[in-house]
Amino acid sequence: MRWKLVFVCVFFVLTGSVLGNAHPQKFEKAEFYAVMKSATPDAINTELETIKDAPEKEREGYEGALLMRKAGLLKKPKDRLSFFKQGRIKLETALVADPDNAEFHFLRLIIQEHAPKIVKYHSDIEKDKALIIKSFKDLSPAVRHAILDYCENSKVLHKEDFS
């Protein structure tokens, strides 16, 4: 009887500590951009949970970008379109609320550059590029690093634009 009680207590202690560490503690921009770059649906789902710790005024933009990124990884066309539309609404809402936020313009540019033509989400690429270049020096180091990293595979942004 005693061993059963000890076993149950140890089990709950271990389970509680493992589950307690399952959720990331804090939103980090560097981690967000790492997930955006080499995303898997599971990594995106984890980051969507982490975004709940992001500042409220920025949460919609990050969440929208992740949902649109996730849409590109799904198999069913219906799911892809649904996630893309949800993400688009969130990101565009964030841009309307804060039209000078260069980071959100960068996120939109990433999505626009890789979006299929059928979703007709390419109209603001040049506008976003201009705002990103103009505001580059004012962005946080994590975002600047993400932009320069993105330039390596971009047809729109180039490292020379920021010299």
Describe the function of each predicted region:
Residues A34-L48, R80-R88, Y121-H122:
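Helix-turn-helix repeat elements of alpha-solenoid scaffolds
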Residues K37, R69-K78, H114-V119:
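Short coil/turn linking the two alpha-helices of tandem helical-hairpin repeats
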Residues E56, N101-A102, L139:
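Residue-level recognition of tetratricopeptide repeat
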Residues D128-S163:
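Terminal, low-structured helical/coil segments at or just beyond the last alpha-helical repeat
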